[in-house]
Swiss-Prot record:
The active site is at H20 (proton acceptor), D123 (charge relay). It comes from Rhodiola sachalinensis. UDP-alpha-D-glucose binds at G19, A350, Q352, H367, W370, N371, S372, E375, E391, Q392. Transmembrane segments: none annotated. Belongs to the UDP-glycosyltransferase family. Its EC number is 2.4.1.-. This is Probable UDP-glucosyl transferase 73B6.
């Protein structure tokens, strides 16, 4: 069969963390629906998660599958079976995990040599995949999994180092050159960015990420042009990157079953969850979740409980503890009994997109990870912003100052995995602010407009639909 008639073959290589895997699996499903032969490359421990997410697409006859390569985590100081960043036992093990991820290069190259795909979509944390693909004449597309805003702000901070001009960690500085005046403090920046931290594994890795991004074929962005047009243009015209925004990727999950099967097995039955939501009035429930990686200490969980109770709002709270012990006394005494008629507590994984899309949900308390942020935007929801680490403080600025659909809870310090401590009064205030009063209604109107815009973008002839088809057409012309 000639290259003109055989389907385009693309390898998708997500970093082993749920926040990276889920959107890339969505992306592979989206590409498969357009006739692309898609192969998702992962490690044996992560294969079941991906398999459950693509089962329905396979039944529909689309060409999508999973292949595995070995992960040598124990050689780098990781516990046996630790193959996902979300399962590392401590923040100190994060660096070991990134080192171990580098050992995937050799088996990945063997896979490329054997199968010769037409393109590789490689996660940002596999910067070497640009050179690996180039060995076999294969173009590599980078996937960061974040917003244009965060990409632009992060690069401006990295290049210009504006934090060197301030005398304290809490003194604000302006990020130079951006379309909007955005202020941050040193305490809100990733620690590996700051001077004196350049010898860290992560700092070196992120330098490689930027270098190989420039030499790659281009960047796929899980966003919508209409959401952040000034930053999409800045990324292309000022930073000189080739890019295609094809999001929101989560919208490829159309029905209840697809939304429920996304990610890990939920800790609650989807029908029980929907039944509870169906019993509530429209826009009356606050959804509280901090992503798959953030795990708060017990004293912070107790503070969240007190703040939510004092807010007087109905809520769904997804609880993930830092501690592995089975004690249940970390919540205030009598809390669950007092809120039982207006709260649903989920200990573990939640069917997030299913919940956010329900008409009863009227607000979202989020850690500002980009997947959650874009899922909230797609659902048309105002948000309480509670950034913890990674690029989340940038995303908070996008929500609160550019899009104006967010209310900051007051987290001020970047802290790996565990976050800055926030008191119950601040939590109560922020939750009420997105749910009550005229300003809350104004935010909700803006958020709803953005939700409609997101859905239009992925429909036929929408901006993201058009970008995807243009990219696929370009790749077909470049077939190996």
């Amino acid at each position: 069969m000639g290259s003109e008639t055989r389907p385009l073959s693309i390898f998708f290589f997500p970093f082993m963390a749920h926040g990276h895997m889920i959107p890339m699996v969505d992306m592979a499903r989206l590409f498969a629906s357009q006739g692309v032969r898609c192969t998702i490359v992962t490690t044996p421990g992560n294969q079941p998660l991906i398999a459950r997410s693509i089962g329905k697409v396979q039944l529909l006859g689309f060409e999508i599958g999973v292949t595995t390569i070995p992960f040598r985590g124990t050689e780098f100081g990781l516990p046996d079976g630790c193959e996902n960043l979300d399962s590392v036992p401590s923040p100190q093990h994060v660096f070991h995990f990134f080192e171990a991820a580098g050992s995937l290069r050799e088996p990945f190259e063997q896979l490329l040599e054997e199968h010769k795909p037409d393109c590789v979509v490689g996660d940002m944390f596999f910067p070497w995949s640009t050179d690996s693909a180039a060995k076999f004449g294969i173009p590599r597309l980078v996937f960061h999994g974040t917003s244009y805003f965060a990409l632009c702000a992060g690069e401006a901070v990295r290049i210009h180092k504006p934090y060197l001009s301030v005398s304290s960690d809490d003194e604000p500085f302006v990020i130079p050159g951006l379309p909007d005046e955005i202020k941050l403090t040193k305490s809100q920046l990733p620690m590996h960015l700051l001077e004196g931290k350049k010898d860290s594994v992560l700092a070196q890795l992120l330098d490689e990420v930027k270098e190989t991004e420039v030499s790659s074929y281009g960047v796929i962005v899980n966003s919508i042009y209409e959401l952040e047009p000034a930053y999409a243009d800045y990324f292309r015209n000022v930073l000189k990157r080739r890019a295609w925004e094809i999001g929101p990727l989560s919208l490829c999950n159309r029905d209840v079953e697809e939304k429920a099967m996304r990610g890990m097995q939920a800790a609650i039955d989807q029908h029980e969850c929907l039944k509870w939501l169906d019993s509530k009035e429209p826009d009356s429930v606050v959804y509280v979740c901090f992503g798959s990686t953030c795990k708060f200490p017990d004293d912070q969980l107790a503070e969240i409980a007190s703040g939510l109770e004092a807010s007087g709002q109905q809520f769904i709270w997804v609880i993930r503890r830092m501690s592995d012990d089975s004690k249940e006394d970390y919540l205030p005494k009598g809390f669950e009994e007092r809120v039982k008629d207006r709260a649903l507590l989920i200990r573990g994984w939640a069917p997030q997109v299913l919940i956010l899309d329900h008409q009863s949900v009227g607000g979202f308390v989020s850690h500002c990870g980009w997947n959650s942020t874009l899922e909230g935007i797609s659902a048309g929801l105002p948000m309480v912003t509670w950034p913890v680490f990674a690029e989340q403080f940038y995303n908070e600025k996008l929500l609160t100052e550019v899009l104006k659909i967010g209310v900051a809870v007051g987290a001020r310090k970047w802290r790996q995995l565990v976050g800055d401590f926030v008191h119950k009064d601040a939590i109560q205030r922020a939750v009420r602010e997105i749910m009550e009063g005229e300003e809350a209604e104004e935010r909700r109107i803006i958020a709803r407009q953005m939700g409609k815009m997101a859905k239009r973008a992925v429909e036929k002839d929408g901006s993201s639909w058009t970008n995807l088809n243009n990219l696929l057409q370009e790749l077909k012309l470049k077939k190996v």
